[in-house]
């Protein structure tokens, strides 16, 4: 009697896992989709079902980081009752916990001698996701305000959130403190500062954040 061969379904997560392992083990990004698929026993049509190129796959990795972060946020039953400031804090804390779990890959892909434009292109979709997340927060806040003059600009706030993430990402990449405790402190101080700026009470937090940056040689 012939033995039935059970085929394992290839998913985007499995392809991403193969890709990240390849990068870490070989310390180089694969250049040929054909060779990559052959080495990992992936049918080319299965690869193209999810990704049109390696560049698209690289963007998808960052999208997964964001999606996994927001999924974890919404699993917390208390999350919806958080203030917008606490939602942003929780988002950054969770995001960087996930990045820490994949730190070797992130450091390699962003620290190699690739052109800056290539690195920014890799983060393009993530930038859109973070800005959309920030827009939702500020629109929730604006909905509770009756005077137009007290409402904040979603566009400005969302761009600020992206700049904040980019700063924290660089800080985290350079952080050598135990458990990346300095990154946690930077998250807390930067989120406090940006929300105080939008509440028009920025002076104390700006001074505090400036002292922190000076101490860490980032000023």
Each language-model region and where it sits:
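Short, amphipathic alpha-helix enriched in basic
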Residues: 2, 10-35, 39-45, 59-63
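Short hydrophobic/aromatic patch on the recognition helix
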Residues: 41-51, 99
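C-terminal peripheral helix-coil segments that are non-catalytic and often amphipathic
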Residues: 174-219
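An amphipathic alpha-helix adjacent to DNA-recognition modules
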Residues: 12-17, 48-74, 78, 89-93
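Amphipathic alpha-helical packing segments from all-alpha helical-bundle domains
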Residues: 120-144, 155-167
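Hydrophobic alpha-helical connector segments
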Residues: 75-108, 115
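Hydrophobic alpha-helical segments that form the core
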Residues: 152-171, 185-193
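Amphipathic alpha-helical segments used for helix-helix packing
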Residues: 100-121, 135-142
């Amino acid at each position: 009697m012939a033995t039935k061969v059970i085929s394992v379904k290839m998913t985007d997560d499995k392809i991403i896992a193969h890709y990240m392992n390849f990068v870490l083990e070989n310390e180089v990004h694969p250049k040929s989709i054909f060779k990559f698929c052959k080495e990992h026993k992936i049918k080319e049509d299965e690869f193209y079902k999810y990704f049109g190129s390696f560049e698209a796959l690289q963007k998808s990795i960052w999208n997964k980081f964001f999606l996994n972060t927001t999924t974890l946020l919404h699993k917390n039953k208390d999350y919806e009752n958080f203030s917008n400031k606490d939602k942003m804090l929780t988002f950054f804390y969770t995001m960087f916990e996930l990045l820490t779990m994949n730190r070797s890959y992130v450091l390699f892909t962003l620290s190699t001698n690739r052109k800056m434009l290539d690195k920014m292109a890799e983060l393009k979709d993530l930038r859109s996701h973070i800005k959309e997340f920030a827009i939702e927060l500020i629109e929730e806040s604006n909905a509770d305000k009756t005077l137009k003059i007290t409402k904040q600009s979603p566009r400005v706030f969302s761009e600020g959130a992206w700049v904040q993430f980019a700063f924290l990402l660089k800080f985290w990449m350079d952080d050598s403190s135990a458990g990346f405790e300095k990154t946690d402190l930077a998250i807390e101080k930067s989120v406090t500062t940006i929300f105080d700026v939008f509440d028009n009470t920025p002076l104390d937090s700006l001074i505090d954040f400036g002292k922190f940056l000076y101490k860490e040689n980032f000023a």
